[in-house]
Amino acid sequence: MSIIIPANSAVGGGYAVDNSCRFNNASDDSLTRSLGASETSLKKGTLSFWIKRAEAVGTAMWIYSNEVDNDNNRAYIEIDANANLRVLNSQGGANPVYFITDAEYRDFGAWSHFVIAIDTTQGTESNRVKIYNNGVQITSFSQATYPSVNTDLKLFEGGQTNKNHIGNIHGQSGKLSAYLSEFVYIDGTQNAATDFGEFDSDSGIWKPIDVSGLTFGNNGVYLDFEDSSALGADVSGNSNNFTVNNLTSIDQTTDTPTNNFATLNPLYKQDGVFSEGNLAYTISASDFDSALS
């Protein structure tokens, strides 16, 4: 059963995603906001996003981060230098939430969907953190640290200024080189993957569904990237807008989870440099390198 959307394809019927946002590490692209102090919950929340990577394996890519005061009190989601998904919540010198997947996410030609759903009030430890990829719960980890029951998490804590990021982490290198689409943060609820997607009845491909009717909570956000003049615009109804850093209208794309475009493949290269979401390949005047899609 296919559970990713391969290159040069579209998912027929149902909900259509019109836009994505292209992040380029070389341009220091990111989105930033000040997370509000009136959280719906410090114990429950969900992040959901579709991603199509553009950075070659060997470079860490920060997807989402929230820093409360310093390196000892922050949380982040990244695809690390080994292409594993990593979820960390660090506070007070400890890591009450720390997960590294065994699976490696190296595909440059396909869109992939992730859901990180947390509820520390759950009595069963394994129910407190659930991570899904393309509709399937991940159960194989090289690192799996579950929070104690009723733990308040820095991942959900607000009140800080300009330290809630998409595509970056405060004061660190390794910004995101990827396309992002349908980015959702739910404040106060542990959602299932089926709140964000479904398997196509004909192809079996995991595809997005309309999320506009979800309850987002006080600090919740939904970025659909449909306004090229305001790529950080929140359409959840909360107006929890992000500030755009170095992104411009040309970084809005129509390469989406329901309309996947072919891009150049950075796994096949010589001395050239890929950029702009693997749409550009730069070589020196003396080189005769080529690139493949």
What do the predicted segments below correspond to?
Residues D28-L88, Q122-E125, T189-T194:
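Extracellular glycan-recognition modules
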Residues S2-N25, S48-V57, Y76-T151:
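Extracellular glycan-interaction surfaces
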Residues I5-A7, R22-N24, I63-E67, A75-D80, ...:
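Beta-strand-rich, repetitive solenoid scaffolds
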Residues L47-R53, F114-I116, I166, L180-Y185, ...:
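Short hydrophobic/aromatic patches on beta-strands that form ligand-binding or substrate-lining surfaces
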Residues M1-K43, N84-V87, Q91-N95, G159-H165, ...:
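Low-complexity, glycine/proline/serine-rich flexible segments
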Residues S2-N19, A26-S27, G123-E125, K130, ...:
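Extended recognition patches within non-cytosolic domains
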Residues D152-L180:
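Extracellular glycan-interaction patches encoded by glycine-rich segments
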